[in-house]
């Protein structure tokens, strides 16, 4: 892509100070490393990148830092952030609205960010948060007045989507969409494959069907390392 080399020049000038500001994102060393690994994969023209990060180590803030850098560098114009349940989407939007980035501005003050409630989006929408389920309905069942184009997004970030079917079964949410776990996986794969975009996925436990889509992790930060580093307490149920 033509904006790749220009973006890498901006990355160098950007530095990571904004992401490490104690009054802002306050990212830890491994979150910066995860972002760097994703940027490196994209600079090498890879179409997919998988980041494996233990539950409770701050995937949402990592994604926020990544999105900010990509938009600030002009590397991507329109980003779809796919989550596997509505509560995670709401939590993400709250983070995007609360965390101060450059010049004390939040992401949604700098860029047009549309949440789960916004079914449609304008041409100037830069970030769109949606559930896998909502896109299955729109793409496979045409449950919308406006169809999504394959090039509507140039980057898709997926958070823990391999858990979607299990959570749906537990919560009784959208169960009719999926006959069983294999059906969920095939529809999930169809949604991911539908878009002609770079794809970055974040997961706590890389399942086989996740690596089949996104490849082996380009960065891993596991539970044991997080405990040794003092960021997670052993045997405690970590916060999501």
Predicted segments with their positions:
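ATP-dependent helicase/translocase motor core
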Residues: 5-78, 87, 91-103, 123-127, ...
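Conserved acidic residues
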Residues: 77, 126, 154, 197, ...
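Conserved nucleotide-binding/hydrolysis micro-motifs of P-loop NTPases
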Residues: 86-88, 133-136, 162-163, 205-209
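Conserved AMP-binding/adenylation subdomain of ANL enzymes
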Residues: 102-107, 230
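Conserved motor-coupling elements within RecA-like helicase/translocase cores
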Residues: 112-128
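Conserved RecA-like ASCE ATPase "motif II neighborhood" in helicase/translocase motors
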Residues: 127-158, 163-187
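Post-DEXD/H (motif II) to motif III coupling segment of the RecA-like Helicase ATP-binding lobe
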Residues: 167-237
């Amino acid at each position: 892509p033509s904006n790749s080399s220009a973006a890498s020049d901006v990355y160098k000038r950007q530095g990571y100070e904004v992401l490490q500001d104690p009054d802002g994102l306050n990212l830890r060393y491994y979150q910066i490393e995860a972002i760097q690994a994703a940027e490196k994969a994209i600079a090498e023209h890879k179409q997919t990148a998988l980041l494996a990060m233990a539950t409770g180590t701050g995937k949402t803030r990592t994604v926020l830092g990544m999105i900010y850098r990509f938009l600030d560098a002009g590397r991507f114009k329109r980003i779809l952030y796919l989550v596997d349940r509505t509560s995670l989407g709401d939590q993400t939007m709250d983070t995007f609205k609360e965390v101060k980035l450059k010049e004390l501005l939040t992401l949604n003050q700098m860029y047009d960010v549309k949440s789960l409630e916004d079914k449609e989006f304008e041409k100037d929408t830069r970030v769109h948060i949606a559930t896998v389920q909502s896109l299955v309905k729109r793409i496979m069942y045409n449950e919308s007045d406006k169809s999504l184009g394959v090039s509507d997004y140039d980057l898709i970030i997926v958070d823990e989507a391999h858990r979607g079917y299990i959570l749906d079964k537990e919560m009784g949410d959208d169960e009719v969409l999926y006959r069983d776990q294999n059906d969920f996986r095939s529809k999930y794969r169809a949604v991911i494959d539908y878009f002609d975009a770079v794809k970055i996925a974040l997961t706590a436990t890389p399942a086989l069907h996740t690596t089949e889509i996104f490849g082996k992790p380009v960065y891993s930060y596991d539970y044991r390392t997080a405990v040794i580093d003092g960021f997670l307490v052993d045997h405690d149920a970590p916060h999501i």
